[in-house]
Amino acid sequence: MAQYPVAQVVGGQQGGVVGVVSQPSDVNLDIGGRVERMQNELDVPEQIVRDLLSVAGADIVVVADDSGSMACVANPGNYSNPMTRWDELRETLIKLAHMLLVVDHTDGFNVQFLNDPAWHELHTKQQVEALFTNRRPSGTTPLGARLQPLLNGSWHPKGHGAETDLILLVMTDGSPSDVDFAGLTRLVQAKAKNVYVTFLMCTEDDDVVGAYNRYLDRIPGVDITDDYASEKREVEAHGRKLSYYKWLAKAVLGGKLVKYDKMDEAPQSCCTVA
């Protein structure tokens, strides 16, 4: 499988990646103090911070939907602040960059759009904003072609054959255009053992979300995460709270740690995140 080019985005220009600035307040803190600082900044429980720290050695890769339907309004009922699915995708990536900086995941994450073969290595909010400058959603949803090299290990941020865990976040609002769900299921079932996948739904369309759940959610190492508004309703229906960063942490961790996959279900055991 051919290797795709890597584009590193810095302040609106391509070039070297800006280094991550460590927080001076952490210099004299022990691990407990650092975890507490991270908890306070993200407003998430200690358990989630420690789980995020536990995957610090993993590579995080995002496949982002830039098809034409992403220009649709995400929540038509929100008259005061209407946002498109594309706007919400951008905000999610900005918050992902921030969350990873807070938990000292200094590698950042790599992004590829469905209709653009270039890879983009991102570390900061400014880099995400630069990536979206003058970029508009258009085209189809070729999930099969984009996911195959990631699932089978022929493309990895550290090079072909790398053995570090790969956390793959697939952000999409529709059905694949180049393969049916049965074909997509076969691709995902054949994934390498070190690849963990979360599909983040950028839509509240019950038919689309239902198809991903029926075909893919039971595959080991795979999680389906609803959009934040829908997931928040589900979690709170079971008596829990769901902040934005808790939802985002669930997306990052859900493919690898089963307790996050079960977070929107009724409590059944001590192994479910509250």
Where are these regions (language model features)?
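Von Willebrand factor
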Residues: 119-165, 176-179, 202-210
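Intrinsically disordered cytoplasmic terminal tails of membrane proteins
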Residues: 1-29, 233-235, 245, 251-274
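…and closely analogous acidic/polar surface helices at protein-protein or active-site interfaces
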Residues: 57-58, 68-108
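Von Willebrand factor A/integrin I-like adhesion domains
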Residues: 126-132, 205-255
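Structural motif
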Residues: 59-61, 164-169
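VWA/integrin I-like adhesion module and closely mimicked acidic/polar interface patches used
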Residues: 138, 174-219, 223-225
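Surface-exposed acidic, glycine-flexible loop patches that form ligand/cofactor-binding
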Residues: 50-54, 99-103, 151-163, 186-189
